Curated annotation (Swiss-Prot):
Matches recorded under Pfam families: Proton_antipo_M
Upper taxonomic lineage: Eukaryota, Fungi, Dikarya, Ascomycota, Saccharomycotina
Subcellular location as annotated: Mitochondrion inner membrane
Origin species: Yarrowia lipolytica (strain CLIB 122 / E 150) (Yeast)
InterPro entries documented for this protein: ND/Mrp_TM
Subunit structure of this chain's protein: Complex I is composed of 37 different subunits.
Family under the similarity heading: Belongs to the complex I subunit 2 family.
Keyword list, A-Z: Electron transport, Membrane, Mitochondrion, Mitochondrion inner membrane, NAD, Respiratory chain, Translocase, Transmembrane, Transmembrane helix, Transport, Ubiquinone
A GO MF term: NADH dehydrogenase (ubiquinone) activity
Function as written in the Swiss-Prot or TrEMBL entry: Core subunit of the mitochondrial membrane respiratory chain NADH dehydrogenase (Complex I) that is believed to belong to the minimal assembly required for catalysis. Complex I functions in the transfer of electrons from NADH to the respiratory chain. The immediate electron acceptor for the enzyme is believed to be ubiquinone.
Protein name as it appears in the record: NADH-ubiquinone oxidoreductase chain 2
Amino acid sequence: MLILAIISLITFVSMSKLSDNRAIIRLINIYLILVLVLDSFLYLLFLNNQTYTVMGELLIFNSFTFYIDMLIYFIMIVISSLYGYNLYNNNLYKTLFEPKKELIILFLINILGALLIVHSNDFITLFVAIELQSYSIYLITAIYNSSYKASKASMLYFFMGGILSILIAYSINTYYSVLNSYTLHSLDSLIINTLDLNLILIALSLGLLFKIGIAPLHKWLISIYENTPILITIYISLIPKISILSYLVLSNISINSLVISILAILTLLVGSVGGLLQIKIKRLLAFSGLTNAGYMMLLLLLNNNEFSYLYYITQYSISHLAIFMIIIFSIYYINYINNQYNPIIYVNQLKGLIHDNAYLVLSMAIVVFSFIGIPPLLGFFGKLNILMSILNNGYYFISIVLIVASLISALYYLYLLNVSIQDKNNILINSNETVSSVLSYILSSLIILITFGFIYNSLIIDIFNVYFN
């Protein structure tokens, strides 16, 4: 139903004659919320831990895919709310990006691709979904190319994405030549997996993982994050990661533990050490995302890893949205002497923010401590679940690497917080405008979820035990 809802939205926005993007976004938000609530009731009534396939087993529906659908919808609601907030402030919107109707359509197409990736039960469906997601992202990043660097980053995204798509397509074609099938179920009929088949699945897994910018092929994606408007950065740094990692966790095609272990360790170390050298906010958060991708990659080594993955991706998504919302809201208070809105590019632009809005700095502290993994915040339980899972499966060296990477990455998280509580070194003029009350409520809700995670942690575990065995 969620997939059909996105298709209907794409049709509506494409054919709509409304010229006011604010009206379109209001309708989209209301529609997404209603569909999400209705689909939740339908799930509780009918699905209830059952697995179904449709369209000749091309798509799969179960508890795992439904949860990821809800998470993607939730993220889209928050981002579209930020987009609406952007439209309501004429002086501020140019700082973020000038809104265009085409962008709304591209976002919806990208969401459709993400949902299809998660539900793919066939390699042909997977490839079509990946290309649907990839080409929409190419266009999303290309729309606002106002500089040479931005244009270069967009072309790099297209070039690297094309190469990885070729690798994925070649792997799928070779898989078919070996098994005469495009489904993973064909593996069940084999008594012994051949070396060729292992290499095929490794190549397919690498193509998918490099799509989300894991090390060592990470620089191109970080360049994209740096040179796109911040609202687009929030989206492309989260949704593709969720869809592809969710598919890998559900399908369990990453069968070679050695390759995944090496890439996960490399991603953890590059993400944690690389972040120490950054002075730009979006690059720092990009390396943070790389480190978190490394954490989630470790779960590909394990069987029955759905609970740990869903818990971690949920708390990471909440923290990711919260920290970017804090950065966006800071634009209201980091107003330079000419009273012009300026994008926050460097970390030191946040210097003295505590004197302008202590609540934002308190919120930042909570999110930063959650990223570090300080108990009893939500991020602590996410990392604890992963650590205990890999320890229970005998990956002791990787556990040590995880702890070391967490300690190193804590340094640049604390650097971000430390700058915001220092004395101001420039003359600031506070804005007369205020943050939208709706967005204030959204940010407050995210902070509450992060802060009081220990209260409902046992409830979350009970729910997962019921619906995910």
